Amino acid sequence: MGEVRTEVNLTNAIDQGLVRRGQLAPDQVRRYKADALVDTGAVRMVVPPHVVQALGLAITGERLAEYADGRKDIVGMTEPIDIVIQGRSTFDEALVLGDEVIVGQTVLEKLDLWVDCNSRRLIPNPAHPDQPVSKVK
């Protein structure tokens, strides 16, 4: 089994809100496109510092991150990011570390996407191929 990567479009969610309120021109919204690693072992989304800077995101807090090798580190947490993968959109904060964008479990669950290990790609949940479904019970 090899790694799974996907195109992800990230947008500053605060910028989007300012556009909706007429306080920012649409062409001023900060966006970033990445070839992201999909990691089902990562719970949260991860963005590196250069992406935080490109999107103009504020660091709103800190979280304790535990790496696969057992090391732990305090890392920054961003304000909300609009995340679009395969036309499906959600909002989430991200941990700030490393040098590449990583899509973790929470984003996959919110977007109702599955990892197809055989073909090394993301696929929509076969039960909900047209749009994500969020369980509320």
Which positions does each model-derived feature cover?
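Pepsin/retropepsin-fold aspartyl endopeptidases
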Residues: 1-137
